[in-house]
Every structure is written in C-alpha cells, then in structure tokens.
Amino acid sequence: MFLSIKNLSATIDGKSILNDFSLNINEGEIHAIMGPNGCGKSTLANVLAGKEDYEITSGDIVFKNQNLLDLNIEERSQLGLFLAFQYPIEIPGVNITPFLKASLNAKLLKENKKEIDAIEFAKKLKITAKDLGIPFEMLSRSVNEGFSGGEKKRYE
C-alpha cells in the first residue's frame, strides 16, 4: 500500500476537524479529496505533511511502509510527501537554476552523498527540463516570477 490512513481523527486548537477518516491509495492511483469548505481537506493535507498545529487524537498513517506519525516534516518531505501550494509564491531576485542546485545539494548532503558540481547539475537540469516540457532558457528567470499558473505547477 502506497498510502494507508486508518481511523484518523485530528484537532486544531481543541476543535475536532477530522473524525475517523480512512483512505487507502495504491501506487500509481490518483484520488481527489473533495468537499465543502470546512470539511477537513486542508486539515488532512496539513496532518499528512506533519504541521505541528494539528493534534492527532487517533488513527494511523502509513506512507511507503513507514509510520508517518513517527516522522518530522523534513523526514516526510524526503520521502516525497509535501504540500504544493495552490498559488506558489514568487521570489524576485532568486534565480531558478542556483535555487534548484542548492536544494538538490542540501538533499544530497542530508543523505551523506557528495554534492553535485555545476557542470553535472546543468546536464541533469537540461534533461529534466526537456522531460517536463520546460524551455531551458526559462531557467534563468527568478523563481515563479511572471510565470503562468501552469508554469508555476511544472516548476513545483
């Protein structure tokens, strides 16, 4: 099972938001969580991401065979679980290419691996940009600055 949520209940500021929620997702499946405002969609996302404002009162969450409740936010993100914002922020003056290289090197160092050099990174970036349909020249822009909504999602 890729993601298994069993009987999850959660509160924020003492207010019960999720009550006995269960969901199983196999690898490769796509699920849409839908519902009216205030039904707990954002709470579920924040709980999965590990935001500390939320208290898990019962239930289990297993992601990629690991108990999420035992992992902090950074450990969850290293497994590939993180929140993607509906409206990603722009970061004027921060160029995408060095930003991505610094992010990758931080991840590699955390894994006790050698940092990637600029030449190797440029090669990997060019291949990845092509695979994602991102024009290579756009990688010289500031993070999300002046991007369309679709472009922002691809860069995420």
Can you name each region flagged by the protein language model?
Residues 60-76, 144:
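ABC ATPase NBD Q-loop/coupling interface
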Residues 25-27:
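Conserved hydrophobic segment flanking the Walker A/P-loop of ABC-type ATPase nucleotide-binding domains
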Residues 49:
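Helix-to-loop junction immediately C-terminal to a conserved catalytic motif
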Residues 34-36:
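The feature captures the beta-strand-to-loop junction immediately N-terminal to the Walker
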Residues 3-5, 18:
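Conserved structural motif at the start of ABC-family nucleotide-binding domains
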Residues 89-156:
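ABC-family P-loop ATPase nucleotide-binding domains
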